[in-house]
């Protein structure tokens, strides 16, 4: 445990894939600060294990961090938040890839799709359990310049982490559950069109991930141009 600033900031090395470590973190936080009122689960790794039938151990590692790391955080911290009778927030960091599922990193898409479903379920369960006292929210960043970006310099199309936080605070104040962030290349209208197309794959009985299917390439281009 490292004290970064006297009395108000602690950094604790934690393997979020291990529930016991989150329990230990929770105890340390409560000893230092008392009951938690804001829990932000920002666990994520972006390694690509490959195709759906490959590298099971690597798939497991990614899901253990990206999904189970968040579940562990909620299960370690939320019970005491509920018991405190104080207002609170839970923010889980998702991804647009968990909604539109672009081919490429299938395991990452899986983890973020499951996280979206989990956070939706969490929000509903909290509303039933305590009304509006503790709310859950899904942060869906756009292209953001972080250590996972892999670029030495910020790409022009990316937002900074600070921009994402400012947008998050604005949307939390408005009461949004889905905090869908734009970036410097993709606006909300574009995101909405892409997401609607993805949902229409089910409704219209198109092939899975038809946006990237050669038979639908021209139709998707016309659809996006018509907005």
Predicted regions located by residue number:
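Active-site helix of classical SDR
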Residues: 74, 111
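Active-site loop immediately N-terminal to the catalytic Tyr-X3-Lys motif
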Residues: 102-106
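The beta1-alpha1 cofactor-binding region of Rossmann-like NAD(H)/NADP(H)-dependent oxidoreductases
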Residues: 13-24, 56
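Conserved NAD(P)H cofactor-binding loop of Rossmann-fold oxidoreductase domains
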Residues: 42-47
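Substrate-binding pocket helix/loop in short-chain dehydrogenase/reductase
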Residues: 50-61
């Amino acid at each position: 445990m490292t004290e970064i600033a006297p009395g108000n900031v602690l950094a604790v090395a934690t393997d979020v894939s291990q529930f016991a470590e989150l329990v230990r973190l929770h105890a340390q936080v409560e000893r230092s600060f008392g009951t938690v009122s804001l829990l932000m689960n920002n666990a994520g790794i972006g390694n690509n294990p490959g195709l759906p039938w490959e590298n099971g151990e690597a798939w497991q590692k990614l899901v253990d961090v990206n999904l189970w790391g968040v579940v562990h955080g909620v299960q370690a911290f939320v019970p005491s938040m509920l018991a405190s009778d104080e207002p609170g927030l839970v923010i889980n960091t998702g991804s647009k890839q968990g909604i539109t599922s672009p081919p490429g990193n299938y395991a990452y898409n899986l983890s973020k799709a499951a996280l979206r479903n989990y956070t939706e379920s969490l929000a509903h369960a909290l509303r039933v359990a305590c009304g509006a006292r503790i709310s859950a929210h899904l942060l869906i960043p756009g292209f953001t310049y972080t250590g996972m970006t892999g670029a030495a310099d910020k790409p022009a199309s990316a937002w900074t982490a600070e921009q994402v936080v400012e947008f998050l605070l604005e949307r939390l104040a408005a009461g949004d559950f889905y905090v869908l962030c734009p970036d410097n290349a993709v606006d909300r209208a574009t995101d909405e069109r892409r997401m609607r197309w993805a949902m229409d794959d089910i409704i219209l009985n198109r092939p899975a991930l038809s946006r990237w299917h050669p038979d639908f390439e021209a139709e998707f281009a016309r659809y996006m141009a018509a907005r």
